[in-house]
A protein has these predicted regions:
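Small-residue (G/A/S/T)-rich helix-start motifs and N-terminal tracts that mark the onset
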Residues: 1-161, 169-186, 191-350
Length: 350
């Protein structure tokens, strides 16, 4: 495999050059990310660019849901709907601007009632789901997660789902959860969530080492999980690893301590959900989502430094990253390097 130069923005060359296995492990860079961008047809409408359903948030973690929704919008989703417990719908409806809200039925102790909630979710028009950020822990949430993974939409292929936070913690208690899942999934655990997941879900450790700092151990463990579960695993942290069931493992070049703050993972979930809704498969959506998120973090760090960055600082930089990637994609089209545009194979345009 030829050596790949890491991300532009002038920041990651040294880190990649010093990585002992850089020639053997694909590293995300601006050219690779640009090739993954979903189409944006000039005559597209809201439905063209995908509908995201975020099942997120609770009274204690309202911010997680708001971050998911804003990130999904900034990553290009045409429509975003936030599904929340019905007693909290007025609170969230007053906070979101571009997103709409949907009430999920509750039981008599104001927990989400899984069965009628699943019926309402499946009746909703969506192209991708983000499940977990800020959900209230408990048996009701665990059952909601189990049922959603196991129950397809009636009239379409099962919508893909991004699983984060409380969804992952619930799955760790479900044993071999993947055997009952009918949906394409992208799991986005941090190392602690990943350890709980693989301990409860029959994944051999695969490698000794620190899953926060040992790149070899992180790649080996993430790949073992992805191949056991049959779903994409995004093992977050410095130099995030994206592992796919087909054996593809990609390492992100980002090492930004400014992202070590609450809510940045919720932003990532929203970005990946938006890319799934725009038609990308789980692997490409995860790779491009990690790239957009990490580069947005670098842009914010350039302005603010590596301390004091807030998760809410990230979404507004995502369109700037995408705009740059569009330029990269244009420059890499056939004929561009020669200074002309090829039309219908007839040679240089006038």
């Amino acid at each position: 495999m030829p050596e790949r130069r890491p991300l532009g923005f002038g920041r990651h060359e040294a880190a990649a050059a010093s990585a002992k296995d850089a020639p053997a492990v694909p590293t995300l860079d601006d050219k690779a990310a640009a090739a993954l961008l979903p189409e944006r047809p000039p005559r597209g409408h809201k439905g063209t660019f995908g509908k995201v359903l975020a099942i997120a948030g609770s009274l204690d973690y309202a911010g997680a849901a708001l971050l998911v929704c804003r990130a999904a919008g900034r990553a290009g989703a045409g429509l975003v709907t936030l599904a929340v417990p019905e007693s909290l719908q007025p609170l969230f409806a007053a906070k979101v601007v571009e997103a709409t809200t949907m009430a999920l039925p509750e039981d008599d102790v104001e927990e989400v009632d899984p069965e009628p909630s699943i019926a309402r979710i499946l009746d909703h028009d969506h192209d991708a789901i983000v499940l977990g950020p800020g959900l209230r822990p408990g048996l009701a949430t665990t059952e909601l997660v189990r049922m959603l993974l196991a129950t397809p939409e009636d009239d379409a292929a099962p919508a893909p789902v991004v699983l984060d936070a409380e969804a992952l913690r619930s799955m760790a208690t479900l044993g071999e959860w993947w055997t009952g899942s009918v949906r394409p999934c992208v799991l986005t655990p941090h190392p602690g969530e990943f350890e709980r997941l693989r301990t409860g879900a029959g994944v051999e450790a695969g490698a000794d080492g620190d899953l926060s700092g040992d790149d070899d151990a992180r790649r080996t463990a993430a790949l073992a999980a992805a191949q056991t579960w049959g779903h994409v695993v995004v093992l977050k942290g410095a130099r995030t690893v994206i592992a796919e069931p087909d054996g593809t493992v990609t390492t992100a070049p980002f090492e930004n301590p400014g992202l070590a703050t609450g809510g940045t993972g919720d932003v990532l979930s929203g970005v990946i959900g938006a890319l799934l809704a725009q038609g990308l498969a789980p692997g490409p959506a995860a790779r491009l989502g990690v790239f957009l998120h990490g580069t947005a973090g670098d842009l914010v760090r350039d302005r603010l430094g590596d301390a004091g960055l807030l998760a809410s600082d990230l979404p507004d930089s995502i369109p700037l990253v995408r705009k740059r990637l569009v330029g990269v994609a244009e420059r890499n089209k056939p004929g561009k390097r020669l200074g002309f545009t090829v039309r219908n194979g007839d040679g240089p345009a006038a």
